[in-house]
């Protein structure tokens, strides 16, 4: 979707803003519900700084005298307009910090907060921790179920829910009941809830809201938050260790040439870099390849989670009720299930998770989600209500046997970048936060004992293996892969029940993930074609209507961030065999094949990058593995609400 033209308030990078003024500006900006624009630069003094927040409210400009010295403070250099434009010839500004964290989800924020707390308690208040987040605001790109197991939160903030805490988190709904159902097309059959899914003592939340709250707490302890900064490149020392990251260049047109607004990205040099990008992060992929971190682990497998938030009729609301289902609408050869959580005031979170190792290229996770809502059990709750939010995100399902090496020279993987999702438990936030806290402790210890240079976080790897993360993931390691064995879905249910109730992970074997998700995809000619019913516009919706609820926004005149080297070659290799699988696995209508008589196949492959909601499914599932998801301009993408 094209960016909207607005009147801008230039605000500088947060580290340059006095705290009193930052607080005032933030309060003013939060009152605006308008979509923000994405002009990339603002000029202060003699240096060009990237805008972090840009929201309309008045025609005034704030002038600030405070600024930090950078290792390179450059005058504006206009890029050459020649065909041979090479941005790497233009020097980037850089800033040196102690720890750089990429990603403002629960893992990254927990790591940042824990680091600064440790440093502050040690009297080392000059210890710099920065966190880069590609979304325009913390929480904007976060989507999750979410029933929170509060163990890590209780440790990080013991009073996070206390009535005596004026800054307490106010949006947690205590879980009251658990139900599990196996769905047929018309019926819902009660089945036992596995012990891992017992939610007594847990809380139904919006993870997006929780991350916003954690962001505020992070600033209070001195973390430097940079939302709107999209890290796009890993930087290396001469010895090959990671020395930080760089943000992407701005002001490059779709044709690859610089515009008048061109600005080079910025480098952040750090002695330790923690990657907290979530599932299948673009920098995480680079680091895993560079250091061969998967050499001793099995292939990762993924799922796609789709979620809507509905406001329902008060008489149908059951605060704290939790429902999970298996079976319909998914076919027998597709792993997955749905959830329905009653939270807040007359709100429900409804979602479907589909394992991306499904074989049938005719299957559409979005289409299956819309079918789910017409099941009598679900429809009876939604009728008379209103869908107010939609989102989708890939998630890790590989479990214990797919965890890579998590430490590398100069940094570590934390949260879903490493893959700590507990699939049978349907939870990953507590493990993500726990991993971030463990990495923070290891990083501070390593840096405190080394005067210079990058570090290796040996203590982090050891800490993981001695943590509750390792214990609980090892216990359930055989459940998810059991559904991909000759046992099938019903055999997988029985086997998982035996593991859950009797063996509890003590079996001497570990089941394997035998292939990757793209390799699991069969040719369209080998599979039954699936026709999806037309949405009614009341309970079910067409995909563009749903995308409009995400608030996603990308400037059109920029290079496509969904990188396909040769679009025609991709179509020739993919379309005849898979018949447009990209259009069906994408939950945002980004990919399509358009009739075009001038093309050899009679169709043209098209990428509608403006629709992208940053779910990463294309990078994971495409059988030809030639779609490379990269970060667009900072601040772009979805602006999720209550997800």
Regions found by a protein language model. Give the residues of each.
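N-terminal mitochondrial targeting presequence
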Residues: 1-87
């Amino acid at each position: 979707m094209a960016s909207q033209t607005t009147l801008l308030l230039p605000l500088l990078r947060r580290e340059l803003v006095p705290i009193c003024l930052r607080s005032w500006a933030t309060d003013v900006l939060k009152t605006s519900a308008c979509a923000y624009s994405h002009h990339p630069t603002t000029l202060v003094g003699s240096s060009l700084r990237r805008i972090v927040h840009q929201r309309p409210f008045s025609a005034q400009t704030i002038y600030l005298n405070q600024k930090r010295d950078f290792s390179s403070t450059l005058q504006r250099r206009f890029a050459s307009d020649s065909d041979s434009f090479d941005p790497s010839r233009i020097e980037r500004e850089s800033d040196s910090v102690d720890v750089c964290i990429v990603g403002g989800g629960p893992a990254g924020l927990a790591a940042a907060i824990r680091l600064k707390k440790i440093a502050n308690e040690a009297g080392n208040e000059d210890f710099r921790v920065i966190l880069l987040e590609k979304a325009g605001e913390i929480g904007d790109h976060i989507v999750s179920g979410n029933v929170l197991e509060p163990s890590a939160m209780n440790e990080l903030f013991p009073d996070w829910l206390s009535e005596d805490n004026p800054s307490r988190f106010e949006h947690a709904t205590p879980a009251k009941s658990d139900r599990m159902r196996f769905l047929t097309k018309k019926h819902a059959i009660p089945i036992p809830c596995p012990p891992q899914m017992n939610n007594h003592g847990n809380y139904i939340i919006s993870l997006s809201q929780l991350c916003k709250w954690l962001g505020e707490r992070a600033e209070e302890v001195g973390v430097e938050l940079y939302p709107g900064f999209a890290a796009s490149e890993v930087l290396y020392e001469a010895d090959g260790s990671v020395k930080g990251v760089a943000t992407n260049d701005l002001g490059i047109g779709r044709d690859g040439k610089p515009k008048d607004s061109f600005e080079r990205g910025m480098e952040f040099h750090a002695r330790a870099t923690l990657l907290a990008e979530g599932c299948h992060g673009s920098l995480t992929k680079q680091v895993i390849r560079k250091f061969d971190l998967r050499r001793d682990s099995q292939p990762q497998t993924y799922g796609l989670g789709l979620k809507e938030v509905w406001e329902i009729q008060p008489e149908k609301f059951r605060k704290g009720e939790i429902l999970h289902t298996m079976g319909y609408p998914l076919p027998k050869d597709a792993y997955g299930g749905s959830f329905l959580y009653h939270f807040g005031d007359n709100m429900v979170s409804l979602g479907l998770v589909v394992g991306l190792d499904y074989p049938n290229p005719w299957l559409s996770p979005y289409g299956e989600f819309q079918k789910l809502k017409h099941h009598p059990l679900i429809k009876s709750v939604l009728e008379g209500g209103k869908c107010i939010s939609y989102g989708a995100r890939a998630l890790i399902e590989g479990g214990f046997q797919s965890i890579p090496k998590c430490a590398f020279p100069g940094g570590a993987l934390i949260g879903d970048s490493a893959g700590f999702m507990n699939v049978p438990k349907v939870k990953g936030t507590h493990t993500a936060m726990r991993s971030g806290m463990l990495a923070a402790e290891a990083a501070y210890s390593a840096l405190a004992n080394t005067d210079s240079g990058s570090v290796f976080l040996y203590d982090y790897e050891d800490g993981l293996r001695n943590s509750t993360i390792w214990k609980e993931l090892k216990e359930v390691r055989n459940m998810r892969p059991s559904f991909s064995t000759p046992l099938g879905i019903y055999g997988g249910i029985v086997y998982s029940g035996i593991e859950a109730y009797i063996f509890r992970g003590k079996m001497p074997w570990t089941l394997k993930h035998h292939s990757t998700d793209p390799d699991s995809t069969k040719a369209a000619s080998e599979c039954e074609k699936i026709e999806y019913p037309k949405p009614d516009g009341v309970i079910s919706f067409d995909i563009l209507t749903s995308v409009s609820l995400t608030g996603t926004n990308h400037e059109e005149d920029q290079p496509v961030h969904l990188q396909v080297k040769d679009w025609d070659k991709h179509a020739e290799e993919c379309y005849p065999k898979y018949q447009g699988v990209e259009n069906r696995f994408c939950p945002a209508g980004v990919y399509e094949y358009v009739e075009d008589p001038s093309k050899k196949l009679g169709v043209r492959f098209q990428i509608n990058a403006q629709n992208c909601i940053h779910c990463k499914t294309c990078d994971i599932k495409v059988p030809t593995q030639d779609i490379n998801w990269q970060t667009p301009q900072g601040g772009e993408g979805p602006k999720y609400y209550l997800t």
